[in-house]
């Protein structure tokens, strides 16, 4: 029996997972415990959870695998420092960071002083972890593997071929050239300054026109071999000035990546307090188009090289679900897989599985497929009952009724009826989702038929930008009737066109460009959620519900107490906690 603990540590989206004999047992991001979005640091609480879920201690763990290797690309780093004029302060900061990253065993001892780790620590190169996280848990025996992000271990992109349990890394793009840096710089320029705000640009883009694509072709230069370079005149990170990434009290932040030359090219940047104007929307649309041009230039080259019709994706840029949804139309690939945590958190999965295959050697046989995302903490019926009892006075003050329903079908019918009446539902079930998407276990649900549902959700709960779309969860067998595709999308990692004749029926989940970021729901993957959607279909004729994350400007709720708190402080109408139906 071999246990491998995988970590994304010392960086944003800190996370841990546990693999036992090639099977994933548990995986969770640290932010869910610390209650700070994208929490960065050492994931001690995530480690505790993973060990508890398996019923073991740190002493039972044979290997700890971290998704970063300080020694990777060492000579390239040295050559760059000696020739590029990078600032001394930046070099010294990186050296200090290296010391902390190298002391994994020490950090484990400090985080869990009552437990002793006697195994081996493995530092696994960042992009190898991304590639492994995409391929080694995919349903495919052979696939082109692609990782694109900001930076990790001095690379910003990597690719290779996965076959069986083997994985090659055949090419890279190195610092300072990066599609992730380009997109983050444009995100900052448009006035979204926080770590992880890139999804806002993706949502804003369809409201604009691609007026700046030709100008941006001077920023991101494409090569015939599929690679790309940045015109460094428009960026500050190459000398370390804009790359001063920091984590303070768990909150990650980065310096300004774009240079003054970018404002000469595109006009003045937007202040975050300034209202959005058409020119900001045009910049967003152009940035998305520029990213897509580079992304598909790379994919086309890789398809020519490998002559394989399957591609698996990871890295932070794998969250660009709009581009992912165009792969079938704009590239020769015919099959796509992106696991539910494609970014750095998911690197812990890659580190663990790559290490398991390495240490087991020829004995390792791939058998695990990540076909659902439910790998986090759950709550027992007793824990739910205790949490409700502790807030009984608050429920009474809010005029709530509380009923425990032992019949799952009746619970789903009652919830579906409430959705059809325009009510907003907090839905808390089973194990927490792995990755940033709510996928039917920690979700807020609504009626996709209501044109006012977006406004209702933003008014009652989310209080977010009006341009951001809400997503549909749809029964898998109904996809072809509602979307211009018929594919498995279990993790909301692809955006597809909704059929033109159906868009007016589901305005709440139809974006301005006629698309939806769907989640396909199966009875095998999430039977209770499938039963709920089926019940809503029986009432409405529509085999989907609106699904957004169960939170209010915070990490997704993890435990019943957080779900109750969110319900009571917002204007949510119904809270379904396991088998308990709570209504105002």
How would you name each of these model-derived features?
Residues 1-5:
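Extreme N-terminal starter segment of soluble prokaryotic enzymes
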Residues 32-56, 295:
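N-terminal phosphate-binding loop and adjacent alpha-helix
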Residues 270-284, 288-293:
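Helix-hairpin-helix/helix-loop-helix acidic hairpins
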Residues 10-29, 34-37, 77-92, 101, ...:
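Flexible beta->alpha loop and helix N-cap segments adjacent to enzyme active/binding sites
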Residues 56-88:
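Hydrophobic or amphipathic alpha-helical targeting/insertion segments
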Residues 45-53, 64-68, 532, 540-542:
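Short HxH-centered metal-ligating active-site micro-motif
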Residues 290, 314, 318-320:
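A general "terminal functional-core" signal
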Residues 285-311:
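Phosphate/ATP-binding catalytic cores across multiple sugar-kinase/actin-like superfamilies
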